[in-house]
From Swiss-Prot:
One of its GO terms (molecular function) is nuclease activity. Belongs to the YqgF nuclease family. Its main location: cytoplasm. Its EC number is 3.1.-.-. This is Putative pre-16S rRNA nuclease. Could be a nuclease involved in processing of the 5'-end of pre-16S rRNA. The keyword Nucleus does not apply. It is found in: Cytoplasm. Signal peptide: none annotated.
Amino acid sequence: MSRTVMAFDYGTKSIGSAIGQEITGTASPLKAFKANDGIPNWDEIEKQIKEWQPNLLIVGLPTDLHGKDLDTITPRAKKFAQRLHGRFGLPVELHDERLSTTEARAELFAMGGYKALSKGNVDCQSAVIILESWFESQWG
C-alpha cells in the first residue's frame, strides 16, 4: 500500500510544506505557513492535513554539516514534530535536511531567476527536497 506523506521545512518565520506519494517517490510544494517565533497558525496546518489526508508527516531536522544538532533551531524543530503528533495523532518522523535550502535556492533560481526566490517558495521547495530524500532513504 502506498502512503501519502506530508513534509515540513520548519523555520521560526516560515514553515514550508510539501506532499508526495511513496509509490512514485516524488513530491510537490504546497504552502508556506507564516510562523511567529516558530509558532504557526495551527488551524491552517489542520486544514491542509484534512484536505490531503496524509498517512505520515516528515519534519526536516536541521543540523550542521557533520550531522550535529544546532543549538537553537534543532530542539525547536523536534518540538514542532512532537506538537504535530500530539495535535493530529499522525506518525511523525524527523529527517536530515542538511543543505536542502541551498539546493532549493539553486533549483528555483534555475527555473525562474531571482523572482522565484521568495521565502515561501524556498521553504516549500526545501520541503520537497526533504520529502524526496526521505523517499530515497526508504528504498535503501
